Amino acid sequence: MFRYESLEDCPLDEDEDAFQGLGEEDEEIDQFNDDTFGSGAVDDDWQEAHERLAELEEKLPVAADEQTGNGERDEMDLLGDHEENLAERLSKMVIENELEDPAIMRAVQTRPVLQPQPGSLNSSIWDGSEVLRRIRGPLLAQEMPTVSVLEYALPQRPLQGPEDDRDLSERALPRRSTSPIIGSPPVRAVPIGTPPKQMAVPSFNQQILCPKPVHVRPPMPPRYPAPYGERISPNQLCSVPNSSLLGHPFPPNVPPVLSPLQRAQLLGGAQLQPGRMSPSQFARVPGFVGSPLAAMNPKLLQGRVGQMLPPAPSFRAFFSAPPPATPPPQQHPPGPGPHLQNLRPQAPMFRADTTHLHPQHRRLLHQRQLQSRNQHRNLNGTGDRGGHQSSHQDHLRKDPYANLMLQREKDWVSKIQMMQLQSTDPYLDDFYYQNYFEKLEKLSAAEEIQGDGPKKERTKLITPQVAKLEHAYQPVQFEGSLGKLTVSSVNNPRKMIDAVVTSRSEDDETKEKQVRDKRRKTLVIIEKTYSLLLDVEDYERRYLLSLEEERPALMDERKHKICSMYDNLRGKLPGQERPSDDHFVQIMCIRKGKRMVARILPFLSTEQAADILMATARNLPFLIKKDAQDEVLPCLLSPFSLLLYHLPSVTVTSLLQQLMNLPQSASAPAPSNSHLTAVLQNKFGLSLLLILLSRGEDLQSSDPAIESTQNNQWTEVMFMATRELLRIPQAALAKPISIPTNLVSLFSRYVDRQKLNLLETKLQLVQGIR
């Protein structure tokens, strides 16, 4: 290795990044020189020796008509001397057939020839065609059967001048000091970088492929990996553990052991790109340093020499075997030669040093490389390629995740999706979809009536009707699991575990358990009755959608469920003449039960609804007490008012007696007023009482054929109600929800004017009358 005085003497290309990196690598190169040749290798003034050698090479005459050979040469002549001309060496690497190609010769002739500068080393080697000398193939084939490609490319030894007859030992540098690592160099030392004078061919090849290990200091790896196209230094190249540029990849985590000759060879081979090798890369091969080609313009060499050199795909191929001989020009088909066909843009290639990758990753890279090659071939190919190109593009557009499922698996997924559309009751399972299309049908019907435009046909999803087997669900029960159900549901709520244990007597626990069980049974009855109510409310829609022959069965089923609801409310047991009010009162004590009764009343018959109203009137004070917090009883006023208009006069009178807690017969003793007082102090009770009085008065005035007994009962009830309204204070009287309009005429028949004004003031009827 030489340290050049200026960047112009450097044999690298005119790359600014390489020039900047050269100065940074000087210190590292000095360290490698010390480790290789000893600490005294650079003590002497070797720069003066290098300049002296450079002046000797400048004095060498470049003879254009020099003879190509002087007879037989021995093996040392084939390897070449140390002062042979690099320009002639490169000229002998040019293939004979390519020079005879007329296309290349025309390209060479059309380019302007640069005039060489006198006294400089930058003169072009293309100044004369006689410089391009042919390689003596037969001579090399006979005398050098085992010569490698690098030795094959070396030209013949030129004639020695008068100064070249001297041995190189006369120009040798002074003796160097002993190196602590590899000892001192031989006595006949030569400048650093000078090729060996004598070396046998087998040993030379063996040193290239399997060099002797020399322990050197491993350099620091680069912080960022360099791109594929950029040049890297030999130190960085040697730091690659599994590079494909080496003959034998090093194992991981082991620093490579290379000889100085291999470092110089890797410097030239690592820069090779697939398909092309520029002349500047030839200039970095050991033995070419310091030659006239080092100072030539690299762009000129890339334009002229790069087209004629055979492609060198990788560094290993450059040292393995010579390229195949090109057929003679007369065998070429008409058209551009193969060297011009190679000028087409090539598809991007993947770097070859992928031995460290996973086998699956390497296979993916290979597949991508094949796809890029096929795509490039289809785009740049000639002839009829329309069908093939379209099929290839379709193949590229193909979804990589396609055909991952078998047809059996696809059918299985389709069946699962179709099962969601199979329903015995689409209106219940897909309520919003059905209502949405009902609205659309109504809008379309309105548009047809108006006749604004043509009828629009809307596509509607047809849900298949499938017979669904109904089975009774029975939760799993385990004996001894705290004595409770293992599955919690609405019908079977799970008991919470008592965290606090209090000491109670057996009687208290028994009573509490009875109350708890009774309430739990009531909740279960409410849930079952609510389920029946929802089914009954849905029968109207089912009746409209059903066929004519199916409607009688639906009506019978509806009546049966209505009777079941009434039995659940009244709690009538088999064989019992009159149901007990206790069961109904327990339902009415729960807020959900009161709302449910208000929804059930319109579906019941008149007799059934009247029975519910009678039970409510008899137990109204107790229900008012339980409803003090919820205040849900007013929701029953509207269905009760509608029911009163369908009841006869006898039933209305009986209801009023039950509400006022009056005896059914005149012989019975007069009851206490606590019951009626509680009714008057509640807005629901007072409103219900006024509605009953108004409806009874209408029935009494409209039907003159009423018996005297019924008339007497009605008159007695009216006097009792009027007397109680006058007795109760106005502050204690509740404000009614609604007031009938015929109350003034009703009270005027039973009281005088003074009492009538007092009643009007209490009930705030003045605004309603006037």
Swiss-Prot record:
Residues 85-388 are annotated as: Region N. Residues 321-337 have a biased composition (Pro residues). Keywords: Cytoplasm, Methylation, Nucleus, Phosphoprotein, RNA-binding. The modification Phosphothreonine is found at T178, T194. Residues 1-397 are annotated as: Involved in nuclear foci localization. Residues 449-770 are annotated as: Region C. The modification Phosphoserine is found at S177, S179, S184, S278. Residues 385-396 have a biased composition (Basic and acidic residues). GO terms for biological process: deadenylation-dependent decapping of nuclear-transcribed mRNA; negative regulation of translation; P-body assembly. The modification Omega-N-methylarginine is found at R385. Residues 389-448 are annotated as: Region H. The keyword Nucleus applies. Its main location: cytoplasm. Residues 1-42, 155-195, 319-340, 376-396 are annotated as: Disordered. A motif (Nuclear export signal) lies at residues 86-95. It is found in: Cytoplasm, P-body; Nucleus; Nucleus, PML body; Nucleus speckle. GO terms for molecular function: G-quadruplex RNA binding; poly(G) binding; poly(U) RNA binding; RNA binding; translation repressor activity. One of its GO terms (cellular component) is CCR4-NOT complex. PANTHER family: PROTEIN PAT1 HOMOLOG 1, TOPOISOMERASE II-ASSOCIATED PROTEIN PAT1. Interacts (via region A) with DDX6/RCK. Interacts (via region H and region C) with LSM1 and LSM4. Interacts (via region N) with DCP1A, DCP2, EDC3, EDC4 and XRN1. Interacts with the CCR4-NOT complex. Interacts with the Lsm-containing SMN-Sm protein complex. Interacts with EIF4ENIF1/4E-T. RNA-binding protein involved in deadenylation-dependent decapping of mRNAs, leading to the degradation of mRNAs. Acts as a scaffold protein that connects deadenylation and decapping machinery. Required for cytoplasmic mRNA processing body (P-body) assembly. The region C, also named Pat-C, is required for RNA-binding and mediates the binding with the Lsm-containing SMN-Sm protein complex and the decapping machinery. It folds into an alpha-alpha superhelix, exposing conserved and basic residues on one side of the domain. This is Protein PAT1 homolog 1. It comes from Mus musculus.
